[in-house]
């Protein structure tokens, strides 16, 4: 079996609520860390989510 070109990552809320999303990204195309604006259900607002490694 070959290795997947996609890496599983965790998107952590910048609001400090410890809420996170998991997603995948292509290792060869996206070398920079991802920042996305997504909904945080804990504070019920859209905030920036930063990429972190999934342990």
UniProtKB/Swiss-Prot annotation:
Biological-process GO terms, alphabetical: translation
One GO term describing the cellular component: cytosolic large ribosomal subunit
Transmembrane domains' residue ranges: none
Pfam families, per database record: Ribosomal_L33
Keyword field: Ribonucleoprotein, Ribosomal protein
GO molecular-function terms, A-Z: structural constituent of ribosome
HAMAP family (UniProt xref): Ribosomal_bL33 (MF_00294)
UniProt similarity note: Belongs to the bacterial ribosomal protein bL33 family.
PANTHER family in UniProt: 54S RIBOSOMAL PROTEIN L39, MITOCHONDRIAL, LARGE RIBOSOMAL SUBUNIT PROTEIN BL33M
Protein name as catalogued: Large ribosomal subunit protein bL33
Source organism of this protein record: Wigglesworthia glossinidia brevipalpis
């Amino acid at each position: 079996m070959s290795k997947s070109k996609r890496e599983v990552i965790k998107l952590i809320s910048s609001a400090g609520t410890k809420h996170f999303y998991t997603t995948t990204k292509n290792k060869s195309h996206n070398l920079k860390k991802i920042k996305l604006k997504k909904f945080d259900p804990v504070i019920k607002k859209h905030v920036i989510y930063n990429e972190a490694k999934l342990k």
